[in-house]
Amino acid sequence: MIGKWRMGLWALAILTVPMYFIVTEGRKTSWGLENEALIVRCPQRGGAINPVEWYYSNTNERIPTQKRNRIFVSRDRLKFLPAKVEDSGIYTCVIRSPESIKTGSLNVTIYKRPPNCKIPDYMMYSTVDGSDKNSKITCPTIALYNWTAPVQWFKNCKALQGPRFRAHMSYLFIDKVSHVDEGDYTCRFTHTENGTNYIVTATRSFTVEEKGFSTFPVITNPPHNYTVEVEIGKTANIACSACFGTASQFVAVLWQINKTRIGSFGKARIQEEKGPNKSSSNGMICLTSLLRITGVTDKDFSLKYDCVAMNHHGVIRHPVRLRRKQPIDHQSTYYIVAGCSLLLMFINVLVIVLKVFWIEVALFWRDIMAPYKTQNDGKLYDAYIIYPRVFRGSAAGTGSVEYFVHYTLPDVLENKCGYKLCIYGRDLLPGQDAATVVESSIQNSRRQVFVLAPHMMHSKEFAYEQEIALHSALIQNNSKVILIEMEPMGEASRLQLGDLQDSLQHLVKMQGTIKWREDHVADKQSLSSKFWKHVRYQMPVPKRPPKMASVAAPLSGKVCLDLKHF
């Protein structure tokens, strides 16, 4: 009896003494930017109906509740208005209720604002995964603040613009979302406390989930009805590749021989190797299967090979056949290489010969193909001779030019080659208007032959002839110019470009001159000399036979006749 009585007393004592349970929750983290508002909530529940005390763990000081302080307690919330870097530390909240004591701690870190507007990863809130069906981004922690609309949104530190972006309450909606919308989004709003406004920003990443799709198989290699050439005894490797889309699905790429899978065909020298899965440039799933035939035989050419690709959309096959490849005839290859080398050498030699003897070849071709050509250009003369008739020199110099113009040129070009020349003083009748006749004769000539000599004096008549001839050749493009330079028998005086008109100087620099020097020409009337070859090359094709054609008839068919043969 005494023992039972004692046990009852102990039970009564236990029931009359209040019981307290202490509940502690792990430490959480929170962060903010300097000079912005930061509000954190006690990690423990029950603070809304029970008193909450906050302590700064670094100093074990209790944080006041008076709102006039920069940091104060409001129920279960701790407010930093605004936050400073030195506020960083561990804060502990204590919730007291009749049944228990709950404690929680927060590791608060206040950062300086990044100078380059790039938010580091440790200051980012949870990432939002978007899609075409869900393109909503929520501004984090906004529910803790006393905020008013609107909320401003930024992407990668740039304000969002355009009709695709819609801000509603604490959400951002993006229409027609795609991969270009991925990035870091920052919401910016205003918190109001005791009539004072504080700025709050929060950043989180947004990614777009790729929506997969599947398509009917597309074989990218080999082409349909592809033919592979292979030599007997060699190894043939043929790849079968196909793409199916981007979604996860059942796919297969394989080879068949006579509609039978390689594994069931029963020949060890014919194997199928699966290649690695690959993705194309547009993200599609592609598979490859390699058919390897070791030691190709004659029977392999009669088999039917199929590259097969399949998924739930269907099956597609590309037939492939083998064809015998003739072995390379190395002897024939040597002959071809040697022939091409000889041909190349011949072409090079021919080019060099033509470059060296081009004038001779051109004259020969002209004499053979077009010895006399009827020209319907309305021209009366083949060439008009322009020469200086007054000199600052001796009479001997004047006589040599006059003799060359009136005797040497006509004797060779008219008598031997059949050209018709117009020479001032020979073909112009007395009593005619010299200026009119000169201009008309130049206009009716196919070539303008300038005879240039040292110490030329620009007489009125000579200057006028030059002006008309150069205008016809350079401006009207009505004729061509031949420049003959009379070189003296010595080095004392040569042709000076400064004595010529500007247009004539330009022609001399562009096309050069044909030089005549009596002491360098063994036979002054020989058509085989370098001088007369160059003159004939620049002259047009004669339209009439030479005056001595009757004498030269028994000879070769050359147009220009060389009197040294008679």
Curated annotation (Swiss-Prot):
Molecular function in Gene Ontology: interleukin-1 receptor activity; interleukin-33 binding; interleukin-33 receptor activity; NAD+ nucleosidase activity, cyclic ADP-ribose generating
Glycoprotein found in the keyword field: yes
Membrane-traversing stretches: 332-354
Annotated disulfide bonds: 42-93, 117-157, 139-187, 240-307, 243-286
Cross-link (Glycyl lysine isopeptide (Lys-Gly) (interchain with G-Cter in ubiquitin)): 325
Post-translational modification: Phosphorylated by GSK3B at Ser-441; leading to proteasomal degradation.
Reaction(s) catalysed by this chain's protein: NAD(+) + H2O = ADP-D-ribose + nicotinamide + H(+)
Domain of life: Eukaryota
Protein's job: Receptor for interleukin-33 (IL-33) which plays crucial roles in innate and adaptive immunity, contributing to tissue homeostasis and responses to environmental stresses together with coreceptor IL1RAP. Its stimulation recruits MYD88, IRAK1, IRAK4, and TRAF6, followed by phosphorylation of MAPK3/ERK1 and/or MAPK1/ERK2, MAPK14, and MAPK8. Possibly involved in helper T-cell function.
PANTHER family: INTERLEUKIN-1 RECEPTOR FAMILY MEMBER, INTERLEUKIN-1 RECEPTOR-LIKE 1
Designated name of the protein: Interleukin-1 receptor-like 1
Native source species: Rattus norvegicus (Rat)
Phylogenetic placement of the source organism: Eukaryota, Metazoa, Chordata, Craniata, Vertebrata
Gene: Il1rl1
